[in-house]
Curated annotation (Swiss-Prot):
Signal peptide (UniProt feature, chain positions): 1-22
Organism whose genome encodes this protein: Pseudopleuronectes americanus (Winter flounder)
Chain's role: Antimicrobial peptide.
InterPro entries registered for this protein in UniProt: Antimicrobial12
The entry's keywords: Antibiotic, Antimicrobial, Secreted, Signal
The name this protein goes by in its record: Pleurocidin-like peptide WF3
Lineage: Eukaryota, Metazoa, Chordata, Craniata, Vertebrata
Biological process annotations from GO: defense response to bacterium
Family per similarity comment: Belongs to the pleurocidin family.
GO cellular component annotations of the record: extracellular region
Length: 61
């Protein structure tokens, strides 16, 4: 009887949840966002070095 009640309650919780509230979806979106952030930081770091070199040239002139 406990198993049946637990199954029914959990089924209702799953069915009443909004489609956008998926826990796995949030994890996947977070991982993608984190990967893009890290990639952007790496790419911006290379641009930062180039900008520093240009700034040194501008000051020297």
């Amino acid at each position: 009887m406990k198993f049946t009640a637990t199954f029914l309650v959990l089924s209702l919780v799953v069915l009443m949840a909004e489609p956008g509230e998926c826990f796995l979806g949030a994890l996947i979106k977070g991982a993608i966002h984190g990967g893009r952030f890290i990639h952007g930081m790496i790419q911006n770091h290379h641009g930062y070095d180039e900008q520093q070199e240009l700034n040194k040239r501008a000051v020297d002139e």
